[in-house]
Amino acid sequence: PVAADNTGIVNEDGTLTVSDGASANSITNAEITYDANDVFDMSAVSGETRSAGFAFNNDGTKMYHAGNDDNAVKEYHLSTAYDVSTATYQGDSEQLTVTSQTNEPFGITFNNDGSKLYVAGNSNVYQYSLSTAYDVSTGSYDSVSFATGDNTSCGIRFNNDGTKLFVAGFASHNIEEISLSTAYDLSTASRSDSDRLSVSAQAQKPRDIEFNIDGTRLFVVS
């Protein structure tokens, strides 16, 4: 994968280690800080104590998280975009239950217009259609899934045009690359063992991933 040359690891002590593969000895550490006033307690409003994957809609006014207690994707509205301290839980009636597909939902992501939702759980990624964009309560399972090659699939991200899906493999310590011949359509997905990045030397049990805007850097949370 192109992004394999550039990786970043978020460490438990709150530092970010970025490694540029073009300069193998070049590693920088940057301290990550946050304001305690910007913390939002999911369990207090939704009863969910085992939060996993997170995602936003395209303008930051809605936030979603996958919860292992209810096996559901829950929806929150933010009065200030991307400010979680302004989040309001929309209630259990506005969630998407995924129990029939997985009992451990982890990573979640949307397609480019919010009409599709993807949920990683156990060894698969599952695809759902939303009749109203970014409204998970309108979601229905497409009866389409794809085996990721890892029995504990966590964070998932698409590239910018939806022709590649990347999966953090918690058990295998790999980042799997999945190719889609039709953008955002899991039924057209294929995977090769050669198209994976092992992060075992840097990040045991990777939980989530993110790219920079042009896909030249990959960041891994473990």
Can you name each region flagged by the protein language model?
Residues P1-I32:
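Extracellular glycosylation-rich, acidic/polar low-complexity regions of adhesion-
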Residues N25-S222:
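Polar, enzyme-active/binding microenvironments
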